[in-house]
Amino acid sequence: KIKKKVFDFKNALSEKKVTNELKKNNIDLICLAGFMKILSKNFIKNFKGKILNIHPSLLPKYKGLNTHEKAIKKKDKYSGCTVHFVNSKLDSGEIINQKKVRISKLDTPDTLAKKILIQEHKLYPAAILKILSL
């Protein structure tokens, strides 16, 4: 059975409470999705090799925000999504898995985002199972 709990992560005090709760429960994996905050180096150090993130580009291309706009502006033929371990550098951790999505000439950032989101919903669970089975 997977135990879950929702945390408010708005400041350093919140981060300390989250860290204590996760350590107390001896967690195996932290999965970020749409988190949109940069974790502190201390938090990452406490859970090294246990934090996953999903990012809407084929890393190492287009780290950070506005990935769909960047891919369309550069006239890329493909974009996609990446599941990776979190380290202290933005969207730079070891890549676990990726899924390509073809960019159509008619795609807008919104339509591309929707296509990639469908693949994210398939890729992330598969990557989580892969990591937990190691």
Enumerate the language-model features and the residues they cover:
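One-carbon transfer enzymes
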Residues: 1-134
